Amino acid sequence: MTAPSVAAEAPLSWGLGGDLLDLNVWLALVVQEHPHHGAARRYWSDCAMARTLGQKQHFCRATMLGLVRLLCQPKLMGEGVLHLPDAWAIYRSLREAEGVDFCVDTESADATLAAWVSDASLSLPARLWSDAWLAAVAESASLRLVSFDADFRRFPLSRCLVLTA
C-alpha cells in the first residue's frame, strides 16, 4: 500500500489559489544537504499535476528575503555559502519556474494579524511573530500554508499542511 500524497487535498480547496510555502520548505527544496530535502522534493513532485492545472506555489516578501539571506549565511550553508548575486539568482530561477508565483502582502493580512494578536486565546509568544505574519498572509490570500514547522497549527488557518521528514 502506498502512502497518500503529502499534497493530497480536496480539489475544491486547491481551487482557492494554491500554497504559500514557508521559508523552511523553500530552503529544503534548494539545499540538497538540508535534512528535509527529500520531503520537500516529494511535496514538490506531488504538486506537479496541480501546477499544470494552474495552481501555484507562492513566495511572499518574507520568504523571498529569508531565502536569499539564509543562502548567504556561512554558519548555515558551510562550504555551500553563496554570494548575494548567486542567492538572488536562485530565487529568480524559482520565481520563473512554471507554477511559482508571488503573493503580495495586503492590508487584509494586517487586519488578520491584528485580530490574532488581540485574541487572548491564541497567546502568541514573541518567537512566533514572523510565523504569525506568514500565516496571516496565507489566510488573507486564501492560500494553504505549507511548512515543516508544527507551530503553525497554533494559528486559526483555514488550510495548513505540516510536512514531515
What are these regions (language model features)?
Residues 59-64, 86, 109, 130:
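Short, conserved alpha-helical segments within structured domains
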